Design a protein with these regions (language model features):
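A short beta-strand-turn-helix
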Residues: 3-20
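Hydrophobic beta-strand anchors of alpha/beta hydrolase catalytic cores
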Residues: 22-23, 53, 76
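Conserved acidic residues
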Residues: 57-59
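Aromatic-flanked redox-active Cys/Sec active sites in thiol-based oxidoreductases
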Residues: 25-30
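Structural micro-motif
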Residues: 19, 62, 68-77
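Non-catalytic, surface beta->alpha helical segment in thiol-disulfide oxidoreductase systems
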Residues: 72, 77-112
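Typically the conserved alpha-helix immediately C-terminal to a functionally engaged Cys/Sec
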Residues: 32-47
Length: 119
């Protein structure tokens, strides 16, 4: 399941995460956002606890999207160690997202390929 995060609790939730964090920025009525959420739900089902996936409604939260200068939706941002690292592009399928994460987080892709955690 993908949890909602707000401007108010963003720094606390992302900063305390022991795993990389993906944040989807979305708004109601955005068809691309709904499609991305479905792909992220599939991704969460495969990677388990090796990645935290959150979503933020930009119509209710302005601070974080403004700091990141988000101008189009959906947008997907990667955080590690509580810090913004980069945006993830090519927001089509779960496999495309995993491909972009592969060089950064080898255990994530190993989980998706084998169906069980690496190690």
């Amino acid at each position: 399941m993908i949890s909602d995060v707000s401007d108010r609790d963003f720094d606390r939730v992302v900063g305390r995460s022991q795993v990389p964090v993906l944040v989807e920025f979305w708004k109601p009525g955005c068809g691309g956002c709904r499609a991305l959420t479905r792909q992220l739900e599939r991704l969460v089902g495969e990677v388990g606890g090796s990645l935290l996936v959150l979503k933020m409604n930009v119509e209710e939260n302005f601070q974080i999207p403004s700091e990141l200068e988000i101008t189009s939706l959906p947008a997907l941002a990667l955080y590690r160690g509580g810090q913004f690292e980069r945006f993830i592009g090519g927001l089509g399928t779960k496999e495309e997202i995993l491909r972009q994460l592969e060089p950064l987080h080898r255990p994530i892709t190993e989980v998706s390929k084998s169906g069980r955690p690496a190690g």
